Curated annotation (Swiss-Prot):
The lineage of its organism: Eukaryota, Viridiplantae, Streptophyta, Embryophyta, Tracheophyta. This is Cytochrome c oxidase subunit 2. Component of the cytochrome c oxidase, the last enzyme in the mitochondrial electron transport chain which drives oxidative phosphorylation. The respiratory chain contains 3 multisubunit complexes succinate dehydrogenase (complex II, CII), ubiquinol-cytochrome c oxidoreductase (cytochrome b-c1 complex, complex III, CIII) and cytochrome c oxidase (complex IV, CIV), that cooperate to transfer electrons derived from NADH and succinate to molecular oxygen, creating an electrochemical gradient over the inner membrane that drives transmembrane transport and the ATP synthase. It comes from Solanum tuberosum (Potato). Belongs to the cytochrome c oxidase subunit 2 family. Its cofactor is Cu cation. Component of the cytochrome c oxidase (complex IV, CIV), a multisubunit enzyme composed of a catalytic core of 3 subunits and several supernumerary subunits. The complex exists as a monomer or a dimer and forms supercomplexes (SCs) in the inner mitochondrial membrane with ubiquinol-cytochrome c oxidoreductase (cytochrome b-c1 complex, complex III, CIII). It catalyses: 4 Fe(II)-[cytochrome c] + O2 + 8 H(+)(in) = 4 Fe(III)-[cytochrome c] + 2 H2O + 4 H(+)(out). GO terms for biological process: electron transport chain. It is an enzyme of class 7 (translocase). One of its GO terms (molecular function) is cytochrome-c oxidase activity. GO terms for cellular component: mitochondrial inner membrane.
């Protein structure tokens, strides 16, 4: 999969957020 720069930036920003949401639900 070839990721666009904005997709990489989005993933870098979203990962900690998603991890925090997962932590809240567990």
């Amino acid at each position: 999969d070839a990721a666009e720069p904005w997709q990489l930036g989005f993933q870098d920003a979203a990962t900690p957020i998603m991890q925090g949401i997962i932590d809240l639900h567990h």
